[in-house]
């Protein structure tokens, strides 16, 4: 939650309003579902492998439905936020994963691949953000009550077209195992660079 607030603060008035994909079922959550809908958050529908095994005629329909839902953004600026680890870092999660990274969980490629598949033609830049909390990861109340004295944010930018042209990502991601392996390897390399940066910051407390 604090990461979201930090990102909104850092990018306020610098990039289009940050949004993130939500499962279609969440539109029915009381109050929040209506708020997300009013704010034009994109809702996605994903079919599981077991569901598609029973209903093979629906293969690809989830992506088609999501692309149609995102058509409104062709004429409206948008930024899509994706937390690639998929969950908050805790030492117990890190240990269970046997993560090869000292400060991070393993990155999951599926979420960002879904965004690129659904909206790749509408997005221009990939903004890679690394957030470091020197005093330890704060709670929501720590942040809003002003008890967080120091936050370090590192930002790097890559053109989406560069990712596409280099073959790092292809639209066949969900059907081609080789594409998935190549994209995951690229993501792992970026995660290693993040981990090295966090290690350096922890060792030197050097401001970004």
List each model region and its residues.
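Alpha-helix N-cap and loop-to-helix initiation/capping positions
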Residues: 57-61, 100-103
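A cross-family acyltransferase "interaction/gating" segment
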Residues: 27-43, 47-49, 74-169
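Hydrophobic helix-cap positions at the C-terminus of alpha-helices
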Residues: 10-11, 72-73, 118-119, 190
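Well-ordered alpha-helical segments embedded in enzymatic catalytic cores
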Residues: 6, 65, 111-114
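A Trp-anchored, charged/polar loop motif used as the substrate-binding/catalytic surface
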Residues: 58-71
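Accessory terminal regions of nucleic-acid processing enzymes
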Residues: 167-208
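Extended interaction regions within the primary functional domain
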Residues: 14-15, 64, 146
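Catalytic core of membrane glycerolipid acyltransferases/transacylases, capturing the structured
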Residues: 1-56
């Amino acid at each position: 939650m604090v990461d979201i607030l930090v990102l909104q603060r850092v990018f306020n008035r610098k990039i289009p309003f940050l949004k993130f994909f939500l499962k279609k079922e969440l539109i029915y959550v009381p109050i929040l579902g209506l708020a997300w809908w009013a704010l034009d958050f994109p809702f996605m529908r994903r079919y599981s492998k077991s569901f598609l095994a029973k209903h093979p005629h629906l293969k690809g329909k989830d992506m088609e439905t999501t692309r149609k839902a995102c058509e409104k953004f062709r004429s409206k600026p948008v930024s899509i936020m994706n937390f690639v680890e998929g969950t908050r870092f805790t030492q117990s999660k890190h240990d269970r994963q046997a993560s090869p990274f000292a400060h991070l969980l393993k990155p999951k490629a599926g979420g960002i691949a879904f965004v690129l598949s659904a909206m790749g033609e509408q997005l221009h830049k990939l903004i890679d953000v690394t957030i470091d909390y020197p005093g330890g990861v704060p709670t929501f109340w720590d942040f809003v009550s002003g008890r967080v004295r120091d936050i370090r944010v590192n930002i790097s930018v890559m053109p989406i077209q560069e990712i596409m042209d280099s073959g790092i990502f292809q639209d066949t991601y969900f059907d081609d195992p080789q594409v998935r392996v190549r994209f995951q390897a690229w993501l792992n390399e970026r995660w290693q660079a993040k981990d090295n940066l966090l290690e350096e910051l922890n060792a030197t407390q050097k401001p970004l």
